[in-house]
């Protein structure tokens, strides 16, 4: 059957208009979503400065512990907003290099949750401790109060190294005079049902527990 070539330009324009219309609709939806998510400009900022545990690897932003803290702050009448500054794979050295970005959001509180990747890679606990101190100091110099979240290593890393690793957080917190949550993954780390199949990253329920256990350390730092 012979095609009517006179229809080709018309069909071409219809395709173009359909694509343009779809893009316009998608753009409008993105704008609407952004407008709904626009933060309160008068709210104080809490930056959560960490690695993939903070970024929420394997869960949604709302399910990750920073998102759960944000929801609880709003529910209990605190005018704060959470900025999730978690970067997967980050170490304390990497964190130190990006503190300036975190300070650009002018946080009144910083939750520092780095060090897990230092330990998993067997890096120097002395250098990690120094990095943590410098990170905390930078936040303090920028006017933020700091909550330092510690980490612990599995027994297979050796008692001596695991002990030095854990003490590094306590010593850094003591020297900088900040609040220490001894173990971010308390009640979650090592529990198969609360972690993804990799055995490292928490499930949504694991993140709920982290947020609940972190809350009592955070509340005394808040104001309404």
What are these regions (language model features)?
Residues 13-26:
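Bacterial N-terminal signal peptides
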Residues 32-88, 98-106:
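Serine-esterase "nucleophile elbow" of acetyl-processing enzymes
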Residues 2-5, 9, 75-78, 94-224:
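Alpha-helical cap/lid subdomain in secreted, periplasmic
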Residues 89-93:
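Acidic-and-aromatic substrate-binding clefts and catalytic sites of carbohydrate-active enzymes
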């Amino acid at each position: 059957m012979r095609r009517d070539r006179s229809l080709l330009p018309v069909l071409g324009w219809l395709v173009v208009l359909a694509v343009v219309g779809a893009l316009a609709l998608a753009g409008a939806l993105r704008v609407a979503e952004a407008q709904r998510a626009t933060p309160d400009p008068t709210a104080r900022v809490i930056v959560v400065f960490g690695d993939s545990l903070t970024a929420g690897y394997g869960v949604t932003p709302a399910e990750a512990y920073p998102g759960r803290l944000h929801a609880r702050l709003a529910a209990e009448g605190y005018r704060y907003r959470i900025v999730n500054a978690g970067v997967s794979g980050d170490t304390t050295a990497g964190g130190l290099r990006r503190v300036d970005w975190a300070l650009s959001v002018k946080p009144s509180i910083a939750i520092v949750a780095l060090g897990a990747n230092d330990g998993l890679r067997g890096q120097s606990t002395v250098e990690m401790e120094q990095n943590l101190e410098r990170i905390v100091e930078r936040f303090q110099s920028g006017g933020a109060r700091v909550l330092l979240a510690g980490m612990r290593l599995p027994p297979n890393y050796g008692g001596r190294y695991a002990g030095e690793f854990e003490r590094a957080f306590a010593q850094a917190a003591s020297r900088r005079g900040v609040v220490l949550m001894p173990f971010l993954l308390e009640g979650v780390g090592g529990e198969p049902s609360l972690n993804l199949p990799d055995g490292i990253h928490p499930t949504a329920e694991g993140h709920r527990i982290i947020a609940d256990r972190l809350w009592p350390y955070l509340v005394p730092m808040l104001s309404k």
